[in-house]
Amino acid sequence: MKVKMLLSLGLLFVSFGFVLNAEKKAKSVKEMNLHDFMEEYTKPATKLYDKKDNADYLNKILEKVPDMAPEDQKAEWKEIIDAKLAVGKPDETCKSCHTKFKKEYKKNYRKKLIQVPEELLGFPKEIKELLKK
């Protein structure tokens, strides 16, 4: 009887652990509109590039940006970003995309939520620390 009870309790705790782990993973997803993403992620990364000549964060962010584009514009966003990264001018990608897509994006997609890629979630804090140095 005690063995069954201990096994049942053990199984309960293991199940509880799985549930908590799944909940933690679900909470690690962050959604925001593209404008807020640019303010929170891209703008500080550009500042880090301008002040410290560190393009690492900006490049990593820009590589993910085409995935956030409307389906029919993904290829063009990627083409613009790849062209600027190829010549070492990541800071010029924003202006290029804004010139071409900003009006339409604001009109049709402004409130659309995008998922922030998990590998970028810690970037704002990391960039802030690097800017302090």
Question: Where are these predicted regions, by residue range?
Answer:
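Positively charged n-region of N-terminal signal peptides that target proteins for export
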Residues: 1-5
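Bacterial N-terminal signal peptides
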Residues: 8-15
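Extracytoplasmic c-type cytochrome modules immediately beyond a signal peptide or single-pass transmembrane anchor
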Residues: 18-93, 102-133
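Short, cysteine/histidine-rich loop/knuckle motifs that typically chelate Zn2+
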Residues: 96
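Short Cys/His-rich local motifs and their 1-3 flanking residues in nucleic-acid-associated proteins
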Residues: 99
